Curated annotation (Swiss-Prot):
It comes from the Bacteria. It comes from Streptomyces avermitilis (strain ATCC 31267 / DSM 46492 / JCM 5070 / NBRC 14893 / NCIMB 12804 / NRRL 8165 / MA-4680). Gene3D superfamilies: 3.30.70.1730, 6.10.250.290. Forms part of the ribosomal stalk, playing a central role in the interaction of the ribosome with GTP-bound translation factors. Keywords: Ribonucleoprotein, Ribosomal protein, RNA-binding, rRNA-binding. This is Large ribosomal subunit protein uL10. GO terms for molecular function: large ribosomal subunit rRNA binding; structural constituent of ribosome. Belongs to the universal ribosomal protein uL10 family. PANTHER family: 39S RIBOSOMAL PROTEIN L10, MITOCHONDRIAL. SUPFAM superfamilies: Ribosomal protein L10-like (SSF160369). The keyword Ribonucleoprotein applies. The keyword Ribosomal protein applies. HAMAP family: Ribosomal_uL10 (MF_00362). Part of the ribosomal stalk of the 50S ribosomal subunit. The N-terminus interacts with L11 and the large rRNA to form the base of the stalk. The C-terminus forms an elongated spine to which L12 dimers bind in a sequential fashion forming a multimeric L10(L12)X complex.
Amino acid sequence: MARPDKAAAVAELADQFRSSNAAVLTEYRGLTVAQLKTLRRSLGEDAQYAVVKNTLTKIAANEAGINTLDDLFNGPTAVAFITGDPVVSAKGLRDFAKDNPNLVIKGGVLDGKALSADEIKKLADLESREVLLAKLAGAFKGKQSQAASLFQALPSKFVRTAEALRAKKAEQGGAE
């Protein structure tokens, strides 16, 4: 690869690191082209999976301010650049690696923080952002319903108590 081509490749990779909220490094040794195509589809629309040259990618990551990945650039390396929900792509990688042991998750970075392979697998065990937001909204809605019931119960209980007192006084007044 000519020097200007290398500089362009480094610039493009650095842009991908900057525009991604997560990147996962994998070793793909032994995977066929068809398997790589299946892997790319399993990552979702918001992820791009690229086979990369270690030296160029290491330089690009450092240019993008990510210097925690240096130890992971050995052997055949591919990077999943994730711009959307990292949980969805992490699930895709984990599930694909279960079915295809030739794919090895090396580690990655999420919002500038280095992640080990185990941390990426734990990330994959989380529910997606949308599901977590829906659960949170459901919890708030349930609490609001309980509060509304409580606020409705207080005045009606007060009215029933006042009515019982009035009836008791009327009964006591009529008995005398």
